[in-house]
Structures are given as structure tokens and as C-alpha cells.
């Protein structure tokens, strides 16, 4: 009888070996991400100096102008269209510094350019910190138990036979560090993320704040989580949508590490919590109250300080402006055309005929219902990171103003969802989703290019239909995310 020798193992391909080296240790990945941003920063300087189409984002010029006003002891809101917290202008004060007279002309020019680019370097560095936090959360696992919970596990096991306590809540298995870095690379090596930050968009700072907030919540550092939540909402309004999900997630069983009642919500549980008072008492736990107090105190303290310094312009430009905002430029939203028509009617000649009902004033209702009520109640207790992703995705998709910078709000959360997602288990589905998402933007950008650079009126039907197409694609992706999180 003939015997067959075992098949020789296939040699690793060069590409798989390269990826293995990249993710096996942190240094190669983070150095690669760092070099990517350095290359883009240098290229941006060249393009700004040699091309009529500038690399630097117009928002960065607004930031640095506001910082210049602050350096002269004036309000950052003296710069028209500055709609951000003064803290951002304070952070960018080094962009106003210049070289001294002791430097020669060439050296002074280099130093001045370097100082002016300080904000871009800061935002790019924030990308790297956000990527590191993504890795930490993935290694931690989505239900990382607190030290108190670990201590209670022994007590739970001892009293388990009495039936008074159920099984302990164990942590979901954290990811292997090398695999976690592979998913963090989706953010760190993403050319879209790196380009937006090196052009001078501050969204990378939000990425750090959001990931730090999630890390603090999952590791049960409630006071720190409250401070980060309050600061994040002050810095940029949208993180307030995370508060309902975090509060709903923070039940006694999850924070203590022990599930009440062996049946996990059987008839006895319902009887003990039947009254409204008992239900309210169970909901208003000390950790929830601590989170609410620290986040609200942080938010109000910062706003009080800024109001004392800069008065009503701070409230108007940082918060109130966004309720009635009608910015239609570079806007992927289906509301784009309506906002354009509304902006055209805001003139003295049209003021008498201007309708009292404005769709842009009510456009926030669908996004708030989805992102602060329906999605948190559905997903938060099952998978908090996926809930935050779905909430952010819904908020951006249904927002009346949707720009490329806003995509970073949910891209930073994407690596936390992908490992268990349908888009990852079915590579074909993932590629289709990515292709449609990119194609939707490309079609819109083609129509916008004809409008802005060729002077052709493409609002109807081209630009509007492209916006609707991109909206439909995003709604489908959102449906898949919610379905995955609800499993």
C-alpha cells in the first residue's frame, strides 16, 4: 500500500510577511502612520506654493485667523465664520509666532512656515493617539470588567449554590494585540483620514476625545468619563448623542460584574421592579448620577468661562448658529438643494415672501430620534461600541450639513465594529459597501465640480439625485450596522 508524504507547508508570500511584520510590533505600524502624515504635510506645502488649488483647508485659515485675534487680546469671533470653541483658537496660538530678527531671510521663512503648520501637526498627531486608543479598546474587549467586578467574582461563585446570585459577568475576550493593530491600521493608514488632518481639519482631536471617552466608560472610570463627555460636547456639539447610550449601558449588573437573578430577567425580577418608584430607584444608580453630574458640571463650567470672556458671540457662533445653519457648499446631504434655495431667499427683496416654516429648522428631528433614542435603546446594552458607531453614522447621514470631515466622526469607531461585522465575515458584501460608498461620493463630487468650477447649474437633477443616491447607500449601510449590533 502506497503511503503519501504530508504536504509541505506553503511558503508565506511577501505581502503576508510584510503585513505580519507591520502588525506584530507597534513600532512599524505607528512609524508608517507617522511617515504617511509627514509626506502629506510636505506635499501640502508644495501644492500651496505652486498650485492655484490649495491643499490647506479653508477652515484652517479660519482657525489661524481666530488665533491671531486672540494673540492680540481680541475675541476669536472677530474672525467671521469662526464657529468653534475658543479653546481651539487657544491651542493654535503657536501658529501666530514668527521668527526673530536674528534669523536670516531664508531661515525666517522656514521657521514661519513651520509655526504656521503647527495646527496641522497637532491634528495629525491626534490621529496617531486616536489610533493607539483604538488598539487599546480592541485589546480590552467591549465589556472589560472593573477591578471591583473581578473581586466580586469569587463571592459570586461561593454563593452560587444558594441561588441568590447568578453567574458572574465575564469580560468579552479581548483581541490579540497584533490583530488589534491590524484593525487600528484601518484608521492609522487611511489616506482619507491622514489627508483631512494634514489639510488642517480639527476632527482628529474629536477622534481622541471620543475614543478616550469610550475607553474610560468600558474601564469603569466614571468620573473621567464624565469629564471627557462634558469637554467633548463643549468642544463639538455632536458627542452629546453618546450620553443616552452610555447611561443605558451603565446598569448595576454590568458595573458590579454580577447578573441579578439566575434567570436574567425572569418573573421574580419583574415583580420586584413592577412599581415606577422601584424602577426609577434601580435606574438612578450612583454611577449614572456621577456621570451626569461630572459631565454637566464640566460642560456648564467651560461654557460659563467662555461666556464671561467673550459674551453672546460665543453662544451664537458655537451653538445657536447650528440650529438654523443653511450652509449648502460642499454638502453631501439631500437637504443641499433646499438649503441653497433658502440661502438665496435670505435677502431684503425676498424677506416679505419668506415662508415661516423652514425645513432646515426641523431637519434635526429624524437624526435626533434615531441617534439619541431608537439606536441607543436597541443596541447600547448589547454592544456599546457598535451603538456609538450606528448613532454617529445616523447623525451624519441625516444631518442637514454633511461634509467629508464629518465622515471621520464615525470612521474612528469603525475598527471597533468591523471584527464582528457582516462586512468583514462576507468580504464580497464589504467590498460592495465600500465601492458604493466611494462611488456615491464620486458621483456627487463630479456634479459639484461642474457646478463650482465649470459654472454649470447642476442642482437639479444632477446634484440632488447624487445626494439622494449617497443617502440611500448610507441608509443601507446603517441598517446592516444596526442589524449586526442587535444580534
UniProtKB/Swiss-Prot annotation:
KW Glycosyltransferase (keyword) present: yes
EC number: 2.4.1.-
GO (cellular component) term, any one: endoplasmic reticulum membrane
Entry protein name: GPI mannosyltransferase 1
Gene name tied to this protein: gim-1
Parts of the chain that traverse the membrane: 26-46, 87-107, 121-141, 205-225, 227-247, 289-309, 359-379, 393-413, 429-449, 462-482
Membrane topology summary: Multi-pass membrane protein
Disordered: annotated segments: 147-175
Subcellular location, principal: endoplasmic reticulum
Family: Belongs to the PIGM family.
Function: Mannosyltransferase involved in glycosylphosphatidylinositol-anchor biosynthesis. Transfers the first alpha-1,4-mannose to GlcN-acyl-PI during GPI precursor assembly. Required for cell wall integrity.
Intracellular or extracellular location(s): Endoplasmic reticulum membrane
One protein family per Pfam: Mannosyl_trans
Amino acid at each position: 500500500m502506497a503511503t503519501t508524504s504530508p504536504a509541505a507547508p506553503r511558503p508565506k508570500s511577501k505581502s503576508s510577511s510584510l503585513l505580519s511584520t507591520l502588525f506584530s510590533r507597534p513600532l512599524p505600524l505607528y512609524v508608517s502612520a507617522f511617515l504617511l502624515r509627514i509626506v502629506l504635510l510636505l506635499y501640502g506645502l508644495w501644492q500651496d506654493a505652486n498650485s492655484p488649488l490649495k491643499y490647506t483647508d479653508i477652515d484652517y485659515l479660519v482657525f489661524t485667523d481666530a488665533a491671531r485675534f486672540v494673540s492680540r487680546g481680541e475675541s476669536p469671533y472677530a474672525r467671521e465664520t469662526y464657529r468653534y470653541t475658543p479653546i481651539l483658537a487657544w491651542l493654535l496660538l503657536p501658529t501666530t509666532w514668527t521668527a526673530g530678527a536674528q534669523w536670516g531671510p531664508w531661515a525666517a521663512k522656514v521657521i514661519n512656515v513651520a509655526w504656521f503648520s503647527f495646527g496641522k501637526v497637532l491634528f495629525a498627531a491626534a490621529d496617531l493617539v486616536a489610533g493607539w486608543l483604538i488598539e487599546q479598546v480592541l485589546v480590552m474587549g467591549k465589556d472589560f470588567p472593573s477591578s471591583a467586578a473581578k473581586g466580586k467574582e469569587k463571592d459570586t461563585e461561593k454563593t452560587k449554590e444558594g441561588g441568590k446570585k447568578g453567574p458572574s459577568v465575564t469580560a468579552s475576550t479581548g483581541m490579540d494585540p497584533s490583530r488589534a493593530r491590524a484593525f487600528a491600521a484601518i484608521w492609522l493608514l487611511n489616506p482619507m483620514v491622514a489627508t483631512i488632518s494634514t489639510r488642517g481639519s480639527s476632527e482628529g482631536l474629536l477622534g481622541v476625545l471620543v475614543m478616550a471617552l469610550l475607553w474610560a466608560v468600558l474601564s469603569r472610570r466614571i468620573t473621567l468619563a464624565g469629564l471627557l463627555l462634558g469637554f467633548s460636547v463643549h468642544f463639538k456639539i455632536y458627542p452629546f448623542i453618546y450620553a443616552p447610550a452610555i447611561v443605558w449601558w451603565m446598569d448595576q449588573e454590568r458595573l458590579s460584574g454580577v447578573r441579578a437573578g439566575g434567570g436574567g430577567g425572569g418573573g421574580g425580577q419583574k415583580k420586584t421592579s413592577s412599581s415606577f418608584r422601584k424602577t426609577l430607584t434601580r435606574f438612578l444608580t450612583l454611577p449614572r448620577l456621577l456621570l451626569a453630574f461630572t459631565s454637566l458640571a464640566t460642560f456648564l463650567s467651560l461654557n460659563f468661562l467662555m461666556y464671561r470672556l467673550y459674551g453672546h458671540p460665543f453662544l451664537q457662533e458655537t451653538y445657536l448658529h447650528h440650529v438654523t445653519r443653511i450652509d449648502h457648499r460642499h454638502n453631501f446631504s439631500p437637504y443641499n438643494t433646499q438649503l441653497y434655495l433658502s440661502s438665496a431667499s435670505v435677502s431684503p427683496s425676498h424677506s416679505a415672501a419668506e415662508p415661516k416654516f423652514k425645513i432646515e429648522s426641523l431637519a434635526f428631528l429624524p437624526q435626533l430620534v434615531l441617534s439619541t433614542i431608537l439606536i441607543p435603546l436597541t443596541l447600547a446594552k448589547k454592544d456599546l461600541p457598535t451603538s456609538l458607531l450606528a448613532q454617529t453614522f445616523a447623525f451624519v447621514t441625516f444631518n442637514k450639513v454633511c461634509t467629508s470631515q464629518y465622515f471621520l466622526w464615525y470612521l474612528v469607531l469603525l475598527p471597533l465594529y468591523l471584527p464582528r461585522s457582516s462586512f468583514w465575515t462576507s468580504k464580497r458584501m464589504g467590498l460592495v459597501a465600500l465601492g458604493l460608498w466611494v462611488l456615491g461620493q464620486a458621483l456627487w463630487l463630479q456634479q459639484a465640480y461642474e457646478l463650482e468650477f465649470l459654472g454649470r447649474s447642476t442642482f437639479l437633477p444632477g446634484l440632488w439625485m447624487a445626494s439622494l443616491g449617497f443617502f440611500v447607500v448610507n441608509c443601507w449601510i446603517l441598517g446592516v450596522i444596526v442589524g449586526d449590533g442587535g444580534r
